[in-house]
UniProtKB/Swiss-Prot annotation:
Keyword terms of this UniProt record: Amino-acid biosynthesis, Cytoplasm, NADP, Oxidoreductase, Proline biosynthesis
Main localization, broad class: cytoplasm
The keyword Transport appears for this protein: no
Organism in which the protein naturally occurs: Streptococcus pneumoniae serotype 2 (strain D39 / NCTC 7466)
Domain of life: Bacteria
Subcellular location: Cytoplasm
Pathway involvement of the protein, from the record: Amino-acid biosynthesis; L-proline biosynthesis; L-glutamate 5-semialdehyde from L-glutamate: step 2/2
Single GO molecular function: glutamate-5-semialdehyde dehydrogenase activity
PROSITE patterns, A to Z: PROA
EC class name: oxidoreductase
Entry protein name: Gamma-glutamyl phosphate reductase
Length: 420
């Protein structure tokens, strides 16, 4: 096993091969990575079967689905890499140019970060997405996968590096930390001078540990306690469609709804319909029904478990939904501000003033009017695959695409000027 220190030194030694690579060279590398990923389908699926067998009974079915790969999912990962090829290269973009009175010409130019570290949990597609985005944005990458997905991740990284071996980009610009212990995560948090940026992708425990302990600069990809508020002026059919999509289309992802807020004027009519749609109809269709966590007012209209205080602060990532009835738009916004992780929140209303108030007052990375929160995604936003959803305000916010993985520098051109 190569030590972490050796890996940090290896990636530092070769980072210039990607930091200064042309767009053509980077695109050739990405295409080779995609081709070799598909070519290694058999090996990747064999590794994934080992991870699935080891994880069964230890993690939820929803989380097992995150971990699971088949040939179609691997092809989708390769397709995601190829989509990055089609995106404009951000490196070298001139952001601003100005000329001073003394004749100096100052150009603000986009540049690579250098080496980016990614700590993430059991999602194999993050491996290929992260590699594609970092390389296209001119960065080398150090990956640290969760132990539940390690065999799969190792097989994916092996395929990606074999692709790079056919190009002029050194394969060591992609590094996979072989040690999946907690100590390896902490080593990355302290790797100042080796990592220029650290991005955690996972649950609240992982993200909080990185934010609290890292001395390397961090972009926080926060958890998603996502709200949908059904206003008194909502179209109920529209609201039910949005709720169904936001909760059930893929409950294990960070942009899935976790909390439903309903105006008291709508509760008596919409909550029984919601119960029919999310419980009775799903049972009839052989699907897992939604389990409700209800406040005292909501429990008057629908059956379910009484909500505990912590239910409104929980990212369930499962077929569980906390429901609260509120007396006003202002109460809904106040609840969101008290419990939100500032990821994605939505209002369903036909009232333009209510929509404007909600979008002005709710301080989240993405705020929706009459649309599902499931759109908070790099691909859906036209950014290609994403590095994560930033819930902080410094440097990057919302879906992080190529530009969010870059910095800038000033190039100052003169003709012998000196400062008096």
């Amino acid at each position: 096993m190569v030590s972490r220190q050796e890996q940090f030194e290896q990636v530092q030694a070769v980072k210039k091969s990607i930091n200064t690579a042309s767009e053509e060279v980077k695109n050739q590398a990405l295409l080779a990575m995609a081709d070799h990923l598909v070519a290694a389908t058999e090996e990747i699926l064999a590794a994934n079967a080992l991870d699935m067998a080891a994880a069964k009974g230890k993690i939820s079915d929803v989380m097992l689905d995150r971990l699971y790969l088949d040939a179609d999912r691997i092809e989708a990962m390769a397709r995601g890499i190829r989509e990055v090829v089609a995106l404009p290269d951000p490196i070298g973009e001139v952001l601003e140019t100005s000329q001073l009175e003394n004749g100096l010409v100052i150009t603000k130019k986009r540049v690579a970060m250098g080496v980016i570290g990614i700590i993430y949990e059991s999602r194999p597609n993050v491996t290929s997405d992260a590699a594609a985005l970092t390389l296209k944005s001119g960065n080398a990458v150090v990956l640290r996968s969760g132990k539940d997905a390690y065999q799969t991740t190792h097989a994916i990284v092996t395929a990606l590096k074999k692709g790079l071996e056919t190009t002029t980009i050194h394969p060591n610009v992609i590094q996979l930390v072989e040690d999946t212990s907690r100590e390896s995560s902490y080593a990355m948090m302290k790797a100042k001078g080796y990592l220029d940026l650290l991005i955690p992708r996972g649950g609240a425990g992982l993200i909080n540990a990185v934010v609290e302990n890292a001395i390397v600069p961090v972009i926080e990809t926060g958890t998603g306690i996502v709200h949908v508020y059904v206003d008194k002026d909502a179209d109920e059919d529209k609201a039910l469609s949005i709720i169904n999509n936001a909760k059930t289309s893929r409950p294990s992802v960070c942009n899935a709804m976790e909390v439903l807020l309903v105006h008291e004027n709508k509760a008596a009519s919409i909550l029984p319909r919601l119960d029919q749609m999310l419980v009775a109809e799903r049972k009839e269709a052989g699907l897992e029904p939604i389990q409700f966590r209800l406040d005292s007012k909501a429990s008057q209209f629908v059956s379910g478990q009484a909500a505990e205080t912590q239910d409104f602060d929980t990212e369930f990532l499962d077929y569980v939904l906390a429901v609260k009835v509120v007396s006003s738009l202002e109460e809904a916004v106040a609840h969101i501000e008290s419990h939100s992780t500032h990821h994605s929140d939505a209002i369903v209303t036909e009232n333009a003033e209510a929509a404007a108030y909600f979008t002005d007052q709710v301080d989240s990375a993405a705020v929706y009017v009459n649309a599902s929160t499931r759109f908070t995604d790099g691909g859906q936003f036209g950014l290609g695959c994403e590095m994560g959803i930033s819930t902080q305000k410094l440097h990057a916010r919302g879906p992080m695409g190529l530009k969010e993985l870059t910095s800038y520098k000033y190039v100052v051109a003169g003709d012998g000027q000196i400062r008096e």
